[in-house]
Amino acid sequence: MTETLSKTTEPSVTTGPIPGSSKAYREVANPDGGPSLRVPFRRVHLSTGAHFDLYDTSGPYTDPDAVINLTAGLPPRPGVIRDRGTQLQRARAGEITAEMAFIADREGMPAELVRVEVALGRAVIPANHNHPEIEPMIIGKAFAVKVNANIGNSAVTSSIAEEIDKMVWATRWGADTIMDLSTGKNIHETREWILRNSPVPVGTVPIYQALEKVKGDPTKLTWEIYRDTVIEQCEQGVDYMTVHAGVLLRYVLLTAKRVTGIVSRGGSIMASWCLANHRESFLYTNFAELCDIFARYDVTFSLGDGLRPGSIADANDTAQFAELRTLGELSKIAKVHGAQVMIEGPGHIPMHKIVENVRLEEELCEEAPFYTLGPLATDIAPAYDHITSAIGAAVIAQAGTAMLCYVTPKEHLGLPDRKDVKDGVIAYKIAAHAADLAKGYPRAQERDDALSTARFEFRWNDQFALSLDPPTAREFHDETLPAEPAKTAHFCSMCGPKFCSMRITADIRVYAAKHGLDTEEAIEMGMTEKSAEFAEHGNRVYLPLTQ
């Protein structure tokens, strides 16, 4: 940390295990010959004496044995190699890196599959050489769908302490990456705190800081100011950067008849520059030099969709797909320079138009990982856009999108707070997991099966612990049945003891076992007994109260 940082009051963050779980690690051999790799996971302890292990993004913040010192930052990962090129270059050379071995264990996949997907450009490992604090992860359609959480201050509200807290909070609930979209004061300092304390890759949009350097006037931006800003962020350790190099002058005119015009902040900045200067943007004309800078640090391109649709009316229009074609051309240039690249996508798209976006991206961009903001499936629900967008996110992820950028309830309304961040992450973890199930991703259904078994066996504490949000699941249950005996009761407050379908089913199975029958035979025998009982009472539907 810099001297300026050390003088800042240290933020407070949430630490400690998630209820019902503990932090655990596996030792994995390092293919580089360095120290063994310590791969983290979350272990859920079940009342049966068994356990269930989960992919974990929370870093040391859920490890009670870890010493958390935000001013000092997280301890660096040992054995980071800076002089052998990018993950893409090494994968193409046939090398399985330490990061690939780490990821293979986390994903439950062969390390060779990880290498091949990276070599083909279908997956990226965002891991700047200068960000050794991260736990390596992968973004690609062959792997689990990932979720990004946006944080960052604005000129109106928030502070460094709040953004650090949001970063730790988001990763606690499953954010796989973080984007710092700060546009207010202390952009460099805020980013430094986040980077030194983030266990997940950190992305940025460099044009925001470059704009601050010219006091918010897009027409004053230059290639030199932007380039120096990128290098500054590369030196700090940013893992991936959004670059709106596909916003061309001729495409800007295509947005004139849109309902919502250009809604991307970066896209609007570059559109303003192009119109003011009557030429193509410096991001486009200097893209090859930018590729060399990114490759030097192994920073991953996130080629931004500056012309994404901001309303259902504008979905899949000429401007959007024209930019996508240019992003495809740029992605090929980036890979020639050895830089990793993923493609950003929309936006606001009705459900019947979503799959077309994935198919076109895969065709034009050689299956580079697709990273989408939602998309929102409808425009009518401000304050609930974490839901409208999670619907679209599940559909687009099933079709092949590799990473989903979350949307919070505050989308279109204001800067998200801590609660909004959690709500957004949970909504998107649901969408990502639903897509993994639909795609047949290995291990995805194991968690569903474990929770369903616990539910059928009325192991309430296990249900809570296996859920995406254990504290909230427990809170909802305890609102009506708070007593401890209710944690083993064979009913909840929805149906009560008489109408619980699972209890009735369990009773049928007990009856079958007692009489040496299978379940169908038990049902038939039970129906026969009830029929006889009905006949004994004179075939009367209603009996006198005395009986």
Swiss-Prot record:
EC number(s) per entry: 4.1.99.17
InterPro entries: ThiC, ThiC-associated_dom, ThiC/Bza_core_dom, ThiC/BzaA/B
Sites where the protein binds substrate: N150, M179, Y208, H244, S264, R265, G266, D305, G306, L307, R308, E344, Y371
Pfam families referenced in this protein's UniProt entry, alphabetically: ThiC-associated, ThiC_Rad_SAM
Binding residues annotated for [4Fe-4S] cluster, in chain numbering: C492, C495, C500
GO annotation, biological process: thiamine biosynthetic process; thiamine diphosphate biosynthetic process
Keywords: 4Fe-4S, Iron, Iron-sulfur, Lyase, Metal-binding, S-adenosyl-L-methionine, Thiamine biosynthesis, Zinc
Family as reported in the entry's similarity comment: Belongs to the ThiC family.
NCBIfam families per UniProt: PRK09284.1 (NF006763), PRK13352.1 (NF009895), thiC (TIGR00190)
Protein known as: Phosphomethylpyrimidine synthase
Gene: thiC
